[in-house]
Regions:
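Short, surface-exposed acidic
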Residues: 25-31, 85, 184-185
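Peptidoglycan-targeting cell-wall enzymes and recognition modules
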Residues: 1-24, 38-135
Length: 209
């Protein structure tokens, strides 16, 4: 299982995550990713998707999928447990996951702005743009769509997308306050619309898709 956001275990892992990435990511990028992590692994770097060992499903802080891609390529750890720290699930694995995330070593970042029917994410086509993001709203949204790319994102169901994002943004706001000691502020007014997004794509590609 995972940890409650305000638990000592979750807080300790948040600070480890921040300390690992702060030299390369803005504090907003870090908190935005943490808001998503809260709803993926609940801050447990050794967690398997559905708490069941399955090398074809998700594993780790951000639920690397398939798990075999992360475990076989970036670690030598085997027999990872879903219930306790084993010889293969040690703190070094959590640090390794941060290193993999630092520059998206697994190549998971994908421009999915066309899946968002209500907010323009075209400024975050690249992972480098995400790492330098300057507000929590965009950070949480960009990580959800372009890194996580979960089933809700792929559904193109606006109501579900908005509800899922609201949960993750609330988590990100809590994480930001924990790791900085202050609230994130109101952030940008989400005035960028799908109409603007589609027009940009039309001007760029000459067609809608």
């Amino acid at each position: 299982g995972g940890y409650e956001t305000t638990s000592d275990e979750a807080k300790a892992n948040m600070f480890e995550f921040k300390d690992s990435l702060i030299s390369d990511w803005t504090i907003y990028a870090i908190a935005g990713a943490l808001g998503n992590i809260a709803n993926e692994s609940a801050f447990n770097p050794w967690r398997w998707q559905s708490d069941t060992v399955n090398y074809n499903a998700g594993y780790g802080l951000v639920q690397f999928t398939p798990a075999s891609g992360y475990i076989n390529e970036f670690t030598n750890y085997a027999n990872l447990s879903t219930s306790e720290i084993t010889a293969g699930a040690r703190p070094e694995d959590g640090a390794c996951q941060c290193d993999v995330l630092r520059n998206d070593s697994m190549g998971k970042w994908t421009d999915r702005s066309s899946y968002n029917l209500w907010y323009d994410l075209s400024s975050f086509e690249s992972f480098s743009a995400f790492k330098s993001v300057n507000n929590l709203y965009d950070a949480t949204m960009a990580f959800l769509y372009n890194y996580e790319g979960n089933a809700v994102v792929l559904s193109r169901d606006e109501a579900r997308q908005r509800a899922d994002f609201a949960i993750r943004y609330a988590s990100a706001s809590t994480c930001y306050e924990i790791i900085t000691g202050e609230p994130p502020g109101p952030g940008p007014v989400p005035s960028r619309t799908i109409e603007n997004n589609l027009m940009k794509k039309y001007l760029k590609y000459g067609f809608f898709f």
